[in-house]
Amino acid sequence: MYNSNSYIPDLVEIQRQGFFYLLEKGIIEEISKRNPITCFEKQIEIFFYPQYYRLTKPFYSIQQAIFYKKSYVSKFYIPVQLTDRKTKRIFLKWILLAHFPLMTNRGHFLLNGSARVIINQLVRSPGIYFRENMHEIFSNKWSEKPSTTFRRFYADIICLKGTWLRIECDKDFSMWAKMKKGPKIPLLWFLLGMGLSEKYILNSVYKPMNLLQSFTKEMEKMQKSKSSKELKYPYISSTKQAWEQIQKLFKLKKTLRKFSFLKKNEEKPKTFIFGQSSTKIEAKVVFSDFAAFNNSVKRENTVFASNDDTFLVQTSFETKKKKNTRKKENFQKNKTQKTTKLSLQNKEKRVASKLEAYELGRKWFANKFMNPRTYDLGKQGRWLINKKLGLTIPLEQTTLTALDVLTATDSLMKIEDGFFEIDDIDHLKNKRVRTAGEALQEIFSIGLIRLEKSIRLKLNGNGQQSFFQKTSFFNFDSLMSTRPINGAFREFFGTHPLSQFMDQINPLAEITHKRRLSSLGPGGVSRDTATLAIRGIHPSHYGRICPIETPEGKNTGLVNSITTYSKISFHGYLESPFYKVYKGQVQRNLGVFYLSPDKDDHFQTATPDLNLTPLGFLPKKPIPVRIGKRFVRMKTHKLALMGVSPLQMISVATSFIPFLEHDDANRALMGSNMQRQAVPLIRPERPLIGTGLEARVVSDSGHAILAKTSGYIVYSSGSKIYLYTI
């Protein structure tokens, strides 16, 4: 039987808390990122004031929305200022931006009369993670065991939006920066491109020679490729990228036999046979679409000049005979395979200075990692990076900085020598919960991007002047449309895998659905490729994720339930309540202390089912204690924390099973899942054997009638209840 002095938190608070954060801060953050919207010439500026937005009273109540099969939404109004710099006129008006879906008191949404629930998603928290990689070298392909095995470490910088960055160390201890797409580059180049000086970089890291090794390797590789290119193709001298594009486009080794081009002030075109001419021509690839200008029966590439410094290259298919015919005259028509435009320039014109190349590199890095529109760590990611690397960068700085990469490089070098430990990616301190509010905030951001594109299209169109020729606000209203944001919400609730039709078989099924935790969906793992390490039970799950309730089949371990007492912190981490213990006495009068997963490994935690004296003292004999992953026996005066209830480690559905400690784990899993499939009785009655949580689940689910004030019930019937209050 359930018996505890601790108070069970609201079972649907997780859903309401996420939506409340969206209304309080999330909407303002997303609109502020898009301010202001300007046209191409920046003569017209549109500015939103998100802190003054208003939501109207819903047109349909909850009961009416269900009865008429309508949506429970509110009109979203926001003040918008439009400034015309050319005529120096300012317009300010409240604009209807969208029909915003509202959450009911029971923690779900109503769309077209149907109740829908947004599942909480458990994903890897944005930040930095240090991992190890085992390299095995076999003496030959038939050997069973590797002849040499060595460890190397790497760091992953994960973001909410943008490109993931990996800093790795190869077998020669050279440092490289690597992205998902593209080749790896020396880490020294990466740091230089982010704006740091070479002297500052080498003086700030633990082992500067590791940075110089990768830099030296890349320079030697470039010198070799440059010398071999000039010997193999003596008639052309171009940048490496230009030559690779020419090879990719025209497959020179297979199809090109002759190069014919017409230079300026020459009458006849010169023809160069592939690989034999010694004439050098500076080439730079310029991509553009051109119509076919020649069809040649021969398999060759022909080049003609189109103006002073450009020429066209055309590749044509070889003429082939049609199949299933005896006539020799029937041939297929020639079709141009590819036509592209190349520009010829003198060597003196295209010599770029080192300063220009440096500025181009800086622009690329700034757009890739320092632009808030293309890269976003989020406040949680910035907080985690600051905590791990010991930085004090403000939480508002959600893009990557040069100091982040430099400090991560220094930490990675120290991990090689054993100064720090690597991260456990399955630990809950490296995972966070994306609530319903965050999912809606992301969809709202997508709708704002669509709205911004439509506004820019209208402002940059031919009818740009028509918006400001009249003094009426009619044309100003036509700039704004509710379709982009409404369409984004409609797509999310209709097609997103985390938006599900609410399970309404019984009150327990409804509560469990709203407290579900899924690792699937966009940004998560796939059920087909998830390993046992992801599905398994981790010691950090204690008091946070139920080890029993999970589906059977492919979703085992990927879909879980939050425990009865757990709650979600501001940063999205699952926290579990504990009592503080001082010199063997449990300090219940101080209330509960919520412990985050990152602090779980540093405290000695006792089980909550110990017998206490009337004054709250623990037994004097050694008791079982958990310290991180280990279970030991320890004297009570060394304890720091104690659990609040035996129900702390299991979910709501599992806590409905009487005498759970005598049940087999596999049967308990099936029982917790099958309880949600029970249909309600026509004549409700109390269970013969219960655990004491039944009434709480019914009240929190919203199925029971709740009195707004306390008092005495003086009369009750099937139609009314009289409550007497003082």
From Swiss-Prot:
GO terms for molecular function: DNA binding; DNA-directed RNA polymerase activity; ribonucleoside binding. It is found in: Plastid, Chloroplast. Keywords: Chloroplast, DNA-directed RNA polymerase, Nucleotidyltransferase, Plastid, Transcription, Transferase. The keyword Secreted does not apply. The keyword Kinase does not apply. InterPro entries: DNA-dir_RNA_pol_su2, RNA_pol_Rpb2_2, RNA_pol_Rpb2_2_sf, RNA_pol_Rpb2_3. Its main location: plastid. GO terms for biological process: DNA-templated transcription. Its EC number is 2.7.7.6. It catalyses: RNA(n) + a ribonucleoside 5'-triphosphate = RNA(n+1) + diphosphate. In S.obliquus the gene for this protein is split in two. Belongs to the RNA polymerase beta chain family. In plastids the minimal PEP RNA polymerase catalytic core is composed of four subunits: alpha, beta, beta', and beta''. When a (nuclear-encoded) sigma factor is associated with the core the holoenzyme is formed, which can initiate transcription. DNA-dependent RNA polymerase catalyzes the transcription of DNA into RNA using the four ribonucleoside triphosphates as substrates. This is DNA-directed RNA polymerase subunit beta N-terminal section. It comes from Tetradesmus obliquus.
